[in-house]
């Protein structure tokens, strides 16, 4: 069976990617990261999801949180803003996060003989993070095949970003068709330890809009003080 490394945050997009990779016949090796996030709920979700969806293995890599300063997702002194439409890159951007995650996934993939890596990056309904754009994914794939023994020998890597051009509505519709239980996922930037969402951040807003527009019941659990 073909192997794939799937970056799994515990959120809606990465879980859909895991389901899609499995539907394509891959043995999926899920890879998650502890990098000083505000809460552990998403990693708990990733663990549940990997087990529920039958991942071949699930590894959680701990990174030095000092690498990721200046982001509201890793620095409790920086407030996570409520959603607002803006072309600017918000304070929730984590410096070079996807570059680091993909580099780790690449090394893991080469070591286990996998040549496919899945990432839930999307350039639609997103917060303008530069490392979610298609040109970044294409460039990293080029790097992967220039910087590895396998790539140089012609056993090429593919960086799969199947949600790249899908709206949140389309992603939810796809996942629903694949049987994804979105009640297992946590997307909120500042969920509490029980996995209950704030309902106000960018990620919550895109998620709420997606379920509503898709006509799919939203299984998200919200904090009691939140008015939805």
Curated annotation (Swiss-Prot):
Coiled-coil regions listed: none
Keyword ATP-binding annotated: yes
Pathway entry: Purine metabolism; 7-cyano-7-deazaguanine biosynthesis
Swiss-Prot/TrEMBL GO biological process terms: queuosine biosynthetic process
Keywords: ATP-binding, Ligase, Metal-binding, Nucleotide-binding, Queuosine biosynthesis, Zinc
CDD domains membership: QueC-like (cd01995)
Enzyme class (EC, first level): ligase
Gene3D superfamilies the record matches: HUPs
Co-factor note (free text): Binds 1 zinc ion per subunit.
Catalysed transformations (reactions): 7-carboxy-7-deazaguanine + NH4(+) + ATP = 7-cyano-7-deazaguanine + ADP + phosphate + H2O + H(+)
Binding residue positions for Zn(2+): 188, 198, 201, 204
GO MF annotations in UniProt: ATP binding; ligase activity, forming carbon-nitrogen bonds; zinc ion binding
Pfam families xrefs: QueC (PF06508)
Domain of life: Bacteria
SUPFAM superfamilies in UniProt: Adenine nucleotide alpha hydrolases-like
Cofactor(s) in the UniProt record: Zn(2+)
Annotated positions binding ATP: 8-18
Enzyme Commission (EC) number: 6.3.4.20
Stored HAMAP family: QueC (MF_01633)
Task performed by this protein: Catalyzes the ATP-dependent conversion of 7-carboxy-7-deazaguanine (CDG) to 7-cyano-7-deazaguanine (preQ(0)).
Protein family (similarity comment): Belongs to the QueC family.
Protein's UniProt name: 7-cyano-7-deazaguanine synthase
Originating species: Legionella pneumophila subsp. pneumophila (strain Philadelphia 1 / ATCC 33152 / DSM 7513)
């Amino acid at each position: 069976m073909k192997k794939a490394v799937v970056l799994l945050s515990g959120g809606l997009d990465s879980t859909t990617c895991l389901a899609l990779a499995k539907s394509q016949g891959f043995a999926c090796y899920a890879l998650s990261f502890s990098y000083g996030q505000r809460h552990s709920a998403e990693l708990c979700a990733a663990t549940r999801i990997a087990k529920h969806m039958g991942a071949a293995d699930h590894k959680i890599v701990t990174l030095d949180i000092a690498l990721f300063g200046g982001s509201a997702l890793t620095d409790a002194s920086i407030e996570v803003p409520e959603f607002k439409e803006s072309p600017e890159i918000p304070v929730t951007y984590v410096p070079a996060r996807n570059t680091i995650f993909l580099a780790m996934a690449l090394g893991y993939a080469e070591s286990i003989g996998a040549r496919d890596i899945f990432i839930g990056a999307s350039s639609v309904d997103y917060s303008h993070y530069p490392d979610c754009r298609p040109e970044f994914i294409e460039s990293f794939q080029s790097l992967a095949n220039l910087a590895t023994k396998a790539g140089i020998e012609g056993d090429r890597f593919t960086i799969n970003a199947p949600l790249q051009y899908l709206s949140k509505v389309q992603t939810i519709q796809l996942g629903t068709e694949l049987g994804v239980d979105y009640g297992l996922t946590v997307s909120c930037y500042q969920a509490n330890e029980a996995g209950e969402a704030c309902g106000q951040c960018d990620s919550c807003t895109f998620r709420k809009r997606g379920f509503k527009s898709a006509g799919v019941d939203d299984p998200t659990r919200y904090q009691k003080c939140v008015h939805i």
